[in-house]
């Protein structure tokens, strides 16, 4: 899911004519990979190896804000299914991921 977000935002970043949008999306796709890696390593340290990761494909949408908002909803639904609430180190990384999404959404909605 996070790799898909990186691909969609990078593609949009390359095709936008808005400098503010270009910069916001650049920050997102650079940051999301670092956070995905950080989460995967910590998760595997606690639970063991994840195994093969299947790559998702994006639903057709021309609106990157809607795409990111949909991903936030999906992440909210999954967070306690993937990691128990009491595992605060991993939940903190998930919170960092949400922080990146929300910061990017702010920049796209109000600054771009």
Positions of predicted regions on the chain:
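Aromatic- and histidine-enriched alpha-helix N-cap/loop-to-helix transition segments
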Residues: 3-4, 96
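Helix-loop segments that flank and shape redox-cofactor active sites
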Residues: 4-27, 82, 86-87
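Amphipathic alpha-helical coiled-coil segments
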Residues: 38-43, 103-112
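Conserved alpha-helical segments that form or flank metal/cofactor-binding pockets of metalloenzymes
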Residues: 22-51
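Acidic/histidine-rich alpha-helical segments that form the ligand environment
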Residues: 55-109
């Amino acid at each position: 899911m996070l790799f898909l977000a990186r691909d969609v935002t990078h593609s949009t970043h390359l095709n936008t004519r808005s400098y503010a949008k270009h910069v916001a999306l650049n920050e997102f796709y650079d940051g999301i990979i670092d956070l995905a890696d950080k989460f995967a390593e910590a998760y595997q340290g606690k639970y063991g190896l994840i195994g093969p990761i299947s790559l998702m494909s994006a639903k057709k949408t021309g609106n990157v804000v809607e795409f990111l908002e949909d991903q936030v909803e999906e992440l909210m639904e999954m967070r306690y299914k993937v990691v128990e609430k009491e595992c605060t180190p991993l939940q903190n990384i998930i919170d960092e991921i949400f922080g990146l999404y929300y910061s990017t959404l702010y920049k796209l909605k109000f600054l771009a």
